[in-house]
């Protein structure tokens, strides 16, 4: 089923709700980067987190970049997501696998804390106007959801609850997504709204299970948690907005990158190989720069 994002409000407009499905985007990233199950889940969580953040931007070309710099064996990650629902990203060590950790009598989970280690979450919000806004917070435990909640608390001072998860069955990711619930800025001093948000969130025992049981129906997922949802707040556009793994790379961007090299470097490439192959870190697309194209770059620098 196509990934998508839904926005709504509850409590008479006092609480903002956003739910996102990133299953297909995660599987596309797995295919392109050769990800393990662990790194597929981590990148899928980062996809969900970045899309949830981007959902509040007022313009469709607004973008959010999440970067994790840490000392764990994952070797960091970078995700770029837009208000338009397009997302892309990569991890430093795509093949990483770790032993599962026991979280209950008969339940096990990926060791996200060990994978990411200690470090920082860097968030860049680019509205397309002026300088991008950058903020950095320490990683809480590497499960992405709590790290994002920490960012929202420290950087935006907004009472928020973040749930991000996935479910794996028969060696495949069958659902991945997230939910963001925020008390809106004009209401963030209302103790009743904050209490309502806390009470609703306490009822979530396993977000991954709730996501799976909703059968990809994000509206049902939201309604199960916030039955007092304001139906009028859900526009047709919000109901149908798609989310997908989409990269902005192109042959022209590759040519522009090559043009940044010194003349001597271009001459060395031409002499040794007669061509160059550029690989996009975000999506692994390959672009061949041929002999004539490199020669033209050299001539233009003469």
From Swiss-Prot:
A Gene Ontology BP annotation from the UniProt entry:
protein refolding
Q: Which Gene3D superfamilies match?
A: Hsp33 domain (3.55.30.10), HSP33 redox switch-like (3.90.1280.10)
What is the recorded function of this protein according to its Swiss-Prot or TrEMBL entry?
Redox regulated molecular chaperone. Protects both thermally unfolding and oxidatively damaged proteins from irreversible aggregation. Plays an important role in the bacterial defense system toward oxidative stress.
Q: Which UniProt keywords apply?
A: Chaperone, Cytoplasm, Disulfide bond, Redox-active center, Zinc
Q: What is this protein called?
A: 33 kDa chaperonin
Coiled-coil intervals: none
Among SUPFAM superfamilies, the record links this protein to: Hsp33 domain, HSP33 redox switch-like
Q: What is its main location?
A: cytoplasm
**Could you say which protein family the record assigns here?**
Belongs to the HSP33 family.
GO MF terms, alphabetically ordered: protein folding chaperone; unfolded protein binding
PANTHER family (alphabetical): 33 KDA CHAPERONIN
Where in or outside the cell?
Cytoplasm
Provide one Gene Ontology cellular component. Answer: cytoplasm
Q: Which HAMAP family match?
A: HslO
Paired cysteines (S-S): 247-249, 280-283
User: Could you state what the record's PTM comment says about this protein?
Assistant: Under oxidizing conditions two disulfide bonds are formed involving the reactive cysteines. Under reducing conditions zinc is bound to the reactive cysteines and the protein is inactive.
Q: Which species expresses this protein natively?
A: Prochlorococcus marinus (strain AS9601)
């Amino acid at each position: 089923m196509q990934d998508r994002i839904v926005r709504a409000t509850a409590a008479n407009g006092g609480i903002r709700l956003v739910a996102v499905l990133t299953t297909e985007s995660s599987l596309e990233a797995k295919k392109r980067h050769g990800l393990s199950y662990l790194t597929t889940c981590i990148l899928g969580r980062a996809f969900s987190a970045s899309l949830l953040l981007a959902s509040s931007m007022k313009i469709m070309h607004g973008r959010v970049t999440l970067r994790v710099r840490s000392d764990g064996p994952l070797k960091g990650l970078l995700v770029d997501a837009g208000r338009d629902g397009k997302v892309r990203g990569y991890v430093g060590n795509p093949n990483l696998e770790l032993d599962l950790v026991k979280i209950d009598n008969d339940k096990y989970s990926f060791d996200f804390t060990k994978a990411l280690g200690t470090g920082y979450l860097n968030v860049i919000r680019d509205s397309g106007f002026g300088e991008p806004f950058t903020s950095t917070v320490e990683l809480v435990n590497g499960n992405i959801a709590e790290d994002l909640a920490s960012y929202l608390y420290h950087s935006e001072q907004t009472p928020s609850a973040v749930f991000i998860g996935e479910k794996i069955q028969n060696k495949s990711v069958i659902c991945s997504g997230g939910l963001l619930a925020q008390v809106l800025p004009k209401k963030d001093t209302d103790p009743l709204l904050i209490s309502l948000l806390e009470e609703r969130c306490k009822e979530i025992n396993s977000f991954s299970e709730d996501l799976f049981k909703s059968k990809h129906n994000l509206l049902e997922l939201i309604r199960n948690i916030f039955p007092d949802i304001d139906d009028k707040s859900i526009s047709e556009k919000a109901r149908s907005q798609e989310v997908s793994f989409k990269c902005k790379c192109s042959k022209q961007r590759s040519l522009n990158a090559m043009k940044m090299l010194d003349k001597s470097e271009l001459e060395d490439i031409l002499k040794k190989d007669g061509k160059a192959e550029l690989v996009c870190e975000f999506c692994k697309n390959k672009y061949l720069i041929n002999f004539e194209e490199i020669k033209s770059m050299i001539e233009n620098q003469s």
